[in-house]
Amino acid sequence: MPKGVFKLPNITNEPIKSYAPGSPERKELKSQINQLRSIVADVPMIIDGKEVRTGKLVDIRPPHDHHHLLGQYHQGDASHVQMAIDAALKAKPAWEKMNWESRAAIFLKAADLLAGPYRQRMNAVTMLGQSKNAFQAEIDCVAELADFFRFNVKNMYEIYHMQPNSAPGIWNRTVWRPLEGFVFALTPFNFTSIAGNLPGAPALMGNVCVWKPSKTAVYSAHLIMEILKEAGLPDGVINLVYCSGPTAADVVFSHKDFAGIHFTGSTQVFNNIWATIVKNIDKYRSYPRIVGETGGKDYIFADPTACPKEVATAIVRGAFEYQGQKCSAASRAYIPANIWPEVENYVQEDMANIKVGGVEDFTNFVNAVIDEASFMKLSNAIDAANKSADAEVIIGGHYDMSAGYFIQPTIIQAFKPDYITMREELFGPILTVYVYDPEKVDETLDILDKSSAYALTGAIFSKNRANIEEMTRSEEHTSELQSHLNLV
């Protein structure tokens, strides 16, 4: 059979649609939302390519409209996790022997299906199941997931081209082989794209996976599997199971063929996973790969020269998009007293224009938090701030779960820099501001550095480039920094 050195198609980012009033995509998406709301979906597990139903039904309800029944999924147990492992290991020999070009073609096809005929269905499923507005859904479950599938192929191509130099008369070669066993993908609710990428990336590289999605993102996970199957993914390569985390962990982490975990979620859960793997290390055929991303206590730091309007925009957009349910969302801000009154005024103006409500109304910028547990955690934090002598709720603070899990975007002013909401992740639409003495920039930067164990994202605002360089150096271990220099 003729062979060749195959060149990939040109890989580019998926364009984002606007969903502006009167646009065809807006009309199509609204129609898809109405269609999904008119039915009660049956959502089975997918093991070895087959739909698995247990009859133990769990309701799927929109977080913003929890009286509406959107669908029901079939709850599994330990036996289904074992079935998924068995199916993955059965599929492994054929999958890992498949040419990389064929594996790449499957995921490129999946990206095209996602961005094409499945686009609005995926948006609608994510919007309804996870309470995302149209724009937040579009950039996540369509554009970012398509980018993951496509750029993973590009990255795989580049990895395979990483080959050693050879001495005269010798041809050295590196073979990038899959892991010995199966990969466990444990995925979050807040990004459909991450949920699809965590099993998708290892599968692309020839691995087989057991995938347990968040119980609040089962609906979109099932649709991802439907797309992958249509794209040609062989049965058993990725197996989708719905069960509790501890149930899955008991089976997965005690199995001799456990080869790796791909995780996004809370820091404490990841710590527990790591400890369990260490405890069981003698059981495994190989050393499991542990890949994970956890929480953040992401900050905004403005120096005395910063532009108040820009800082206010960063606060509102950085803290409240998707209800602050992003590990990269801003949740604490350090603002000097000389610009704080102006910043607060701009924030008040911006937040007065923010609408809170269901995703079906495209003018709602903020929707519901994911579930009752999240609602209770956030409302308790607001109540505690209202009662504390060390903090004050200065904007927002209202909440209501009568129809959906709605938390009004809220800003707390902390009078002490170590107030609890300056340190601990809440994962919701609450940002805490500490107003500091403009003469104590360095001291406040030191407080910022030592206040939280998290180091994910941060933003520094200044009109002085030298200040930005100095602050960036001092905070380089606190986050993946972004700096903002106002040139006007």
Residue ranges and their predicted role:
Residues 227-232, 254-256, 260, 267-417, ...:
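ALDH superfamily catalytic-core signature
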Residues 67, 88, 103, 206, ...:
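Residue-level signal for inorganic ion chemistry
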Residues 1-70:
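Hydrophobic face of amphipathic alpha-helices that form TPR/SEL1-like repeat modules
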Residues 84-94, 109-113, 117, 125, ...:
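Generic, well-ordered alpha-helical scaffold segments in large soluble proteins
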Residues 53-55, 59-61, 66-160, 450:
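Glycine-rich loop-to-alpha-helix module at the N-terminal edge of alpha/beta enzyme cores
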Residues 125-132, 164-168, 361-367:
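Short linear capping/connector segments at secondary-structure termini
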Residues 1-7, 14, 18, 65-71, ...:
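Conserved C-terminal structural/oligomerization subdomain of aldehyde/semialdehyde dehydrogenase
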Residues 127, 145-146, 154-310:
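Rossmann-like NAD(P) dinucleotide-binding subdomain of oxidoreductase/dehydrogenase enzymes
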